[in-house]
């Protein structure tokens, strides 16, 4: 399988990288296969860093993800002018079909895997810088894309349809009843959002970040990206801490954010700075966190209510109501 891909790379090397091609490249499979897809990193002879990323898909589901990601990256490349932003995500190079496979080739984005920066106690002093860098990137991305993304309506509209539950609608009503704007009415935070901002999709560069895996990009609020990132970062840190203390279960999101936990405190401080940059009141921090996690609950469910019993929908309804009560009965 690697021979046709190697031939494709070498034949277009000059075009993509503006230099003469090497005698050969070594294609290394990284990570694990996932639903008929895998990733290759091509290293030229003697090279210390891969020159690009090759994503290969055999099934239609994964092939459609590659096409969608390639289209999203192409759209961003044609619309954005901020060079710092352009340098933070991959450049799409080619989308080719070979022997029943769909192959997407992107430029390589350097940086340190963010989960490794969140996993060790001695890294704790770095985490505020990491959080601020992610927040700054999201604010810049929103500012650069707000004129490109379709605008939301002025009511609950599309947001309500997407939530598929009366509990979130009630949360939106309570937000308005407490004098807080809902995401639908926050035009200052509407633009394109990454859509899947997990820690493993963020690369730490010391003073800036890189962002990869763009197949879920869509119109929306950057606040959703932010709180989804915080929730998964909390789970990453909680899991590492529980592994160090044998027999202790990882803390739930509720424990991290509504009880005293060092990451919850750092996350809330970073959230206040994030909202300041967006010119939003800090009192929106907790409601927006709950709303975002409620919307992503099907992905976060195993961590939301550890030890809970009962039907999924019933438990989630009780949990969301408790979170709403926590939000509006605590100081923001």
Where do the protein language model's features map onto the residues?
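ATP-binding glycine-rich phosphate-binding loop
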Residues: 17-46
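Conserved kinase catalytic-core helix
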Residues: 75-83, 109-152, 182-186
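Short beta-strand micro-motifs within the conserved protein kinase catalytic domain, predominantly
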Residues: 89-101
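A glycine-centered beta->alpha junction motif in the catalytic cores
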Residues: 98, 106-124, 143, 293-307
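Active-site Asp-x-Gly
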Residues: 207-257
